[in-house]
Amino acid sequence: MRFSKIYIEITNICNLNCSFCSKDNRLKKELSLQEFDIVLKKIRQYTNTIYLHVKGEPLLHSKLLEILELTEKYNFKVKITTNGTLLKSKLNILQKFTNIKQINVSLHCENNLVNYFTDVFNTCDILAKNIPIVYRIWLLDNYKLDKLSTIIVDNLISHYKLDKSFLNKVIKKKNIKIKDNIYLDKDNEFKWPDNIQDNELDKGTCLGTRSHIAILVNGDIVPCCLDSKGILKLGNIFEDELEDVLKSELFLKINQGFKDNKLTCNLCKNCNFRIMKFNK
């Protein structure tokens, strides 16, 4: 089995405390270079693309340069999701790597930085010469622009000298091209799943275990990138071989269930993101 991508949580530490990001009691840590090397060696026959996040701010990793050097050493394509606050300070590092294939910037992050938009947009303009940039905004409901979304769009219009009709495009479309290699993606805000109460919903599917799996900072392997608490732990990358994990009873049950449009786990039944995407 091969996956289109595997999520690796290189740190679960963040420099912000956004209200839409769920809280947990996990030990705050980052993967050591030795641990990251082990992870890459164990997954390289299963994917060639990795996302350097589940929770946490990946650019906060104290050995970011060395982390990216390891991804280059093992020929991985890398995609990064960031809140953007550290982009300017990490620009020189990010520019070194041709294997970074996309940077997603969550513009909806809650920060008090006076020059946030200016610094993010100017830095991304430089990065976009070689790396696709996707700005992301979260909407409250039914793709309607709230106050913060409107502020973000106004700043985009101002910086990129966009026509005022751009606002209508944002309202009507999910994905908009701003300029070469720079895009805006919008989606409804979702709740991180942690409800494991049973309910009557038993029909549905998802891409977890099918297109991807995730590895948390403590090594726990989970079915999807939203199981940040390791509720559906399948194994541990430092203790188990991935081949064995993918043959485990729980993995096969979840995987076959999604193929059959059947929800086999309570976490999946209560996943707000999955419901928005697949139970429309």
Label the predicted regions.
Residues 44, 91-113, 150-179:
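Structural recognition of alpha->loop->beta junctions
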Residues 1-103, 111-118, 278:
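Conserved alpha-helical substructure of the radical SAM core
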Residues 110, 126-158:
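Conserved strand-turn element in the central/C-terminal portion of the radical SAM core barrel
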Residues 209-211:
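Short loop/turn microsegments at loop-to-beta-strand junctions
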Residues 14, 18-21, 206, 224-225, ...:
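Short cysteine clusters
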Residues 215-216:
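Short, acidic, Ser/Thr-enriched surface-loop or helix-capping motifs
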Residues 127-132, 158-201, 226-276:
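C-terminal accessory region of radical SAM enzymes
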